[in-house]
Regions:
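N-terminal transmembrane-helix/juxtamembrane module of multi-pass inner/ER membrane proteins
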Residues: 1-47, 62, 78-104
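Interfacial segments of alpha-helical transmembrane regions
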Residues: 49-77
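Membrane-embedded catalytic cores of phosphoryl/pyrophosphoryl-handling enzymes
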Residues: 94-179
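Residue-level signature of the transmembrane alpha-helical core
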Residues: 35, 50-51, 68, 136-140, ...
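Membrane-water interface at transmembrane helix exits
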Residues: 53, 78-86, 125, 172-176
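Membrane-helix interface segments
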Residues: 27-29, 59-63, 91, 128-134, ...
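Small-polar-interrupted transmembrane alpha-helices in polytopic inner-membrane proteins
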Residues: 68-82, 133-145
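Multi-pass membrane proteins that catalyze or facilitate reactions on polyprenyl-/lipid-phosphate substrates
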Residues: 1-11, 22, 53-56, 64-65, ...
Length: 179
């Protein structure tokens, strides 16, 4: 029986997940990615929005409201996509993969953490480009943590990144920056 290109891709992706997940056997790696993932649950973004308001007043409030509106759209979008796709998480599909932290929901596609991190970062950087040295590495860490911790496939993270770019771009077009 022939293997389809999609099956080959799924096999490669599963191997990549197993390899990435193996790094969490090291306590420091596991702790680092667990903390990044936990901050990506929302804590980091809520603190950032509050700090923007405190440090930049009305302009910070405007940026924070824009981020919150984009975050709400991201939440509704990814919840709907997860219910529609119903893709099992890597640890549920392959017993060699361990979930090193508890997932927030049942399904894998797309990565909600990544979708939020990328969309929040794009909107925040539109207002405050000088935050890039903080936000870009953190966002990359959130995306990577989802695969390393056994919660997402790389394609979940890549798809979420693409969706987030489209969503953030649409929000910036719909709610343009003040002149």
């Amino acid at each position: 029986m022939r293997t389809t290109p999609l099956e080959l891709l799924a096999g490669r992706e599963a191997r990549l997940c197993r390899r990435a997940n193996h790094y969490c056997r090291r306590r420091r790696v596991r702790r680092l990615f667990s903390v990044i993932s936990r901050l990506g649950d929302g804590v980091f973004w809520y603190v950032l929005m509050g700090a923007l308001v405190l440090l930049d007043g009305f302009d910070g409030l405007r940026a924070s409201v824009h981020m919150a509106a984009t975050g709400l759209a991201a939440l509704l979008l990814y919840k709907g996509l997860k219910r529609w796709a119903r893709r099992p998480r890597p640890y549920a599909a392959d017993l060699r993969i361990r979930a090193w932290v508890a997932p927030l929901d049942e399904f894998s596609f797309p990565s909600g953490h990544t979708l939020h991190a990328v969309s929040f970062t794009i909107v925040a950087l539109a207002y405050y480009p000088w935050l890039a040295p903080l936000l870009v590495p953190f966002t990359f860490g959130v995306a990577l943590s989802r695969v390393v911790l056994g919660l997402h496939y790389p394609s979940d993270v890549l798809a979420a990144t693409g969706i987030a770019i489209l969503l953030a771009s649409a929000s910036l077009a719909w709610l343009p920056l003040p002149v």
